[in-house]
């Protein structure tokens, strides 16, 4: 009698499950077996196993998936963070390459500021002992002479812009030949290279407007080809971009 009842229940269940997929049929059958079993005759451990089998998508699986998703998110974050570190390393590498390139192309000594010459001997020593590839621009000035202060200020800017050029200044009274450099011919520019005087300009401020700046002096010297090609400040631009980020 019991056997006939079970057979009838299974036939009824199979009839209801004919429109589900294979996995759905199996899960429904497991659920049905759990419900049709006598609860008093099934051990608790077996009922738990049957329950888990009838519900494959249980909470533990969901928790595992959530943990996996969180783990993947962390991995993605680490990848993004690593990409950013790689980008920073690439920038540092490029900057180092640019520095190396500048050093190779800009061979020779570098200065970057204006040298104050105190005596005639120091003036001669600077001209004679400097490397032959170095251009030396000397401003002979005197305090109180019109245009001398402005030219000294222009030299400060140009020395920073053209570090391969040695910019110097000396008072006319300290040259040992003050009678040759009276206030009438000041300010005077003397340009040397390889120990030789290659150009000179007396009363040079007459070439400028009443008020002039470093750019005016730069243009004037460039007209005579006395300055090298100005260095491209790519490294400074790169640093600014990194600071911005």
From Swiss-Prot:
Coiled coil: none annotated. Keywords: Cell projection, Cilium, Cytoplasm, Disease variant, Nucleus, Phosphoprotein, Sensory transduction, Vision. It is found in: Cytoplasm, Cytosol; Nucleus; Cell projection, Cilium, Photoreceptor outer segment; Photoreceptor inner segment. One of its GO terms (cellular component) is nucleus. Residues 1-68 are annotated as: Disordered. The modification Phosphoserine is found at residue 73. GO terms for biological process: regulation of G protein-coupled receptor signaling pathway; visual perception. The keyword Cytoplasm applies. Residues 58-68 have a biased composition (Basic and acidic residues). It comes from the Eukaryota. Interacts with CRX. Forms a complex with the beta and gamma subunits of the GTP-binding protein, transducin. It is linked to Defects in PDC are the cause of photoreceptor dysplasia (PD); an autosomal recessive disease of miniature schnauzer dogs causing retinal degeneration. Belongs to the phosducin family. This is Phosducin. It comes from Canis lupus familiaris (Dog).
């Amino acid at each position: 009698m019991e056997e006939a009842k079970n057979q009838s229940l299974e036939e009824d269940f199979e009839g209801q499950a004919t429109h589900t997929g294979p996995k759905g049929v199996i899960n429904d059958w497991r659920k049905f077996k759990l419900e049709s079993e006598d609860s008093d005759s099934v051990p608790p451990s077996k009922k738990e196993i049957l329950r888990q089998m009838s519900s494959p998508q249980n909470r533990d699986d969901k928790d595992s998936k959530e943990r996996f998703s969180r783990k993947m998110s962390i991995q993605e974050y680490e990848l993004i963070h690593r990409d950013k570190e790689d980008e920073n390393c690439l920038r540092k590498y490029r900057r180092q390459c640019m520095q190396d390139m500048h050093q190779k192309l800009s061979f020779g000594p570098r200065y970057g500021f204006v040298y104050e010459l105190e005596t005639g001997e120091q003036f001669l020593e600077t001209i004679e002992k400097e490397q032959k590839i170095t251009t030396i621009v000397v401003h002979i000035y005197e305090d109180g002479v019109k245009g001398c202060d402005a030219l000294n200020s222009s030299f400060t800017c140009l020395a920073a812009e053209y570090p391969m050029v040695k910019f110097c200044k000396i008072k006319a009274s300290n040259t040992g030949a003050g009678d040759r450099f009276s206030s009438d011919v000041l300010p005077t520019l003397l340009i040397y290279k390889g120990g030789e005087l290659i150009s000179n300009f007396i009363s040079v401020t007459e070439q400028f407007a009443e008020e002039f700046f470093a750019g005016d002096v730069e243009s004037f010297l460039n007209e005579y080809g006395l300055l090298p090609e100005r260095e491209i400040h790519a490294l400074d631009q790169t640093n600014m971009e990194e600071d911005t980020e």
